[in-house]
A protein has these predicted regions:
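Helix-start/capping segments and mature chain N-termini
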Residues: 1-157, 163
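N-terminal auxiliary "cap/dimerization" subdomain that precedes the catalytic jelly-roll/cupin core
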Residues: 158-183
Length: 183
């Protein structure tokens, strides 16, 4: 019972995390669109980091079963929310956009860093707005962000190569991030 807890505890683990193989940070990674939707905000607000990642884990399993390491999760309205462990950004015609927080995603620290610091420093216009899957498929570039994911280029599973989504914008943005150290 939560009210019987006399003293709260905090556990901190400090370690280097590398979510993906080193090559994916430079060459990009394929992503699929998960069949499982993101939980509605009214049921479990994903902006609260409560460690309840069951929905994300099930979508991640779906991706891994397809031979892919990451999946884009849609909300129950069919709009892009986030990936299983990362925020998603789209570059189209020189504008960087990302789903707004109403889409039902965790408001990531690295996401905010791109919005507040990186994009403006490089002269990009940034928009927080709704995205359809077609927006992702029609993007000039797609990248994922996260504290552990850093900045990772992405491509549709159907795309021929991740290079199709890695243009000059990604290289410029990537210069603001240090990739995970290779041991």
């Amino acid at each position: 019972h939560p009210f019987k807890c006399e003293r709260s505890s905090v556990i901190i683990i400090a370690d280097v995390i590398s979510l993906y193989p080193d090559s994916m940070y430079t060459e990009g990674m394929s992503v699929i669109v998960a069949k499982r939707p993101r939980l509605p905000v009214a049921c479990l607000d994903p902006r609260i980091k409560s460690l309840n990642y069951l929905n994300n884990i099930l979508a991640k399993i779906e991706a891994i079963d397809a031979g892919i390491l990451e999946a884009i999760m849609l909300n129950t309205e069919g709009l892009v929310a986030e990936c299983t462990g990362d925020n998603i950004f789209i570059i189209k015609d020189g504008v960087i956009s990302t789903p707004d927080t109403e889409a039902g995603m965790l408001h990531g620290i690295t996401r905010q860093y791109v919005i507040d610091t990186v994009a403006p420093a490089l002269g990009y216009t940034i928009e927080e707005r709704s995205h359809q899957v077609e927006d992702v498929k029609g993007a000039d570039e797609v990248f994922l962000t996260g504290t552990a994911a850093h900045l990772t280029p992405a491509a549709q599973q159907e795309a021929t190569t991740a290079e199709a989504f890695r243009q000059n914008g990604f290289v410029k943005l990537g210069s603001y991030f240090t990739p995970p150290e290779v041991e």
